[in-house]
Amino acid sequence: MAVTREDIASALAQALAPSRLEVQDDSHLHAGHAGAREGRHFSVRIDAEAFRGLARVRRHRLVYDALASLMPQGIHALAIDARTPDER
């Protein structure tokens, strides 16, 4: 079963308790791209206190850790914008 944006949103909400969360399926923008056959492309905008004091790489690691069980199920690409609530 293919991963949906709802699957991603649920996993991130449970792991990081974000104050803002937007998940967009960008797969249609990559039609014909070799990786599009093997998985889907998503963009995530997330604001969470869990990111406070962390560098961008550590923030992205938290997001990837939260999605670890979904990654092998069909996420080919993930664009991440991770901030604290007061950084927006």
Give residue ranges: language-model regions.
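N-terminal/domain-start segments enriched in small and hydrophobic, helix-friendly residues
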Residues: 1-5, 10, 48, 66, ...
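N-terminal first-folded block
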Residues: 2-35
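Solvent-exposed beta-strand sheet faces enriched in polar/charged residues
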Residues: 24, 45-47, 81-83
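Residues within mature, well-folded domains
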Residues: 29, 49, 85-87
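A short interface-forming secondary-structure element
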Residues: 38, 46-57
